A protein has these predicted regions:
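Short, charged phosphate-coordinating catalytic segments
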Residues: 164-188
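Active-site/catalytic core of tyrosine-dependent DNA strand-transfer enzymes
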Residues: 209-263
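Conserved tyrosine-mediated DNA breakage-rejoining catalytic core shared by Y-recombinases
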Residues: 179-216
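Structural signature of tandem alpha-helical TPR/SEL1-like repeats
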Residues: 18-36, 62-72, 99-109
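Short helix-capping/linker turns of helical repeat alpha-solenoids
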Residues: 1-2, 7, 11-14, 18-19, ...
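Basic, Lys/Arg- and aromatic-enriched nucleic-acid-binding interface segment
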Residues: 133-169
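TPR/TPR-like alpha-solenoid helical repeat scaffolds
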Residues: 87-91, 120-136
Length: 263
């Protein structure tokens, strides 16, 4: 397969980074290059798919195909090619308004690239999924509650779980109370979108970076497994959920102005 890669690169007059080699004389033969690079790629060489993604965008290539180019790029990314992962992530983010869940796919690829040391991916993630700063609306009071917290976990386990999510993923009050737990878990991130039930809700992502965060989310998802998270479910509408939260915070002695901080 290495020989196939080298042969394909030779015909393309390119290096493994997809750059044109000025030291190679003669015109490129992209058709032959595609043949050999495809064979190398099908045997698991990510570099072959990455170079193919470059060839298919060449205006001088008679079989130029932007869709095929992106398909090759994704195959390279799937095989762990960091530059391809970065490029897939940025492409998905640019197209987030045209394709459903493109922001989720963008975060996935950028996390993969970041794990391989990409500073560009890390910077992009900071813009795409910044850590929320919801302020203190009472979610931290439960940590010092002791016996009342244990009582809440017994009497209102769903509310207790939502407070736990709020602390770990910096959720606002409205996000914590209205989050669709089933749809939020995307594996690598939490998709927070309460816009359908809250006028000020904005879609955003919270990255899952640690094993502890993953473990907590798994526990919460299991708890909500057979629960309808919608307003017709057992938790009721936003006002009903908010009332239960306020009653609990009042028991803890949380100042009323804290309860009414903007959600």
């Amino acid at each position: 397969r290495t020989a196939q890669l080298e042969l394909g690169l030779g015909y393309a007059r390119m290096d493994a980074h997809g750059q044109r080699l000025a030291t190679r004389n003669g015109a490129a033969n992209f058709k032959r290059a595609v043949r050999w690079l495809t064979q190398a790629g099908e045997q698991g060489l990510a570099e072959a798919w990455f170079v193919l993604s470059r060839i298919y965008t060449k205006p001088e290539f008679s079989q130029r195909n932007v869709v095929e180019a992106h398909s090759c790029l994704e195959r390279a990314a799937d095989l762990g090619h960091a530059p391809a992962q970065l490029e897939c992530g940025m492409h998905a983010w640019r197209n987030r308004r045209e394709s459903v869940n493109s922001d989720v796919r963008a975060a996935y690829w950028l996390l993969q690239a970041q794990a391989q040391g990409s500073a560009e991916a890390e910077a992009a993630l900071a813009r795409i999924a910044p850590r929320g700063e919801p302020g203190d609306w009472g979610q931290w009071a439960a940590l010092q509650a002791g016996s009342p917290l244990r009582q809440l976990e017994q009497n209102q386990p769903l509310l207790a779980a939502r407070l736990e999510l709020a602390r770990w993923f910096h959720l606002s009050r409205a996000e914590a109370l209205l989050l669709d737990v089933h749809g939020a878990d995307q594996g690598h991130c939490l998709l927070i979108d309460i816009s359908a039930t809250h006028g000020r809700g904005k879609r955003r992502l919270a990255l899952i970076r640690t094993a502890q965060e993953r473990q907590l989310l798994d526990q919460v998802v299991r708890l909500f497994e057979r629960v309808d998270c919608g307003v017709t479910g057992p938790e009721g509408n936003y006002r009903q959920r908010l009332y239960r939260l306020k009653c609990y915070l009042a028991e803890l002695g949380v100042a009323q102005e804290q309860q009414f901080l903007a959600a």
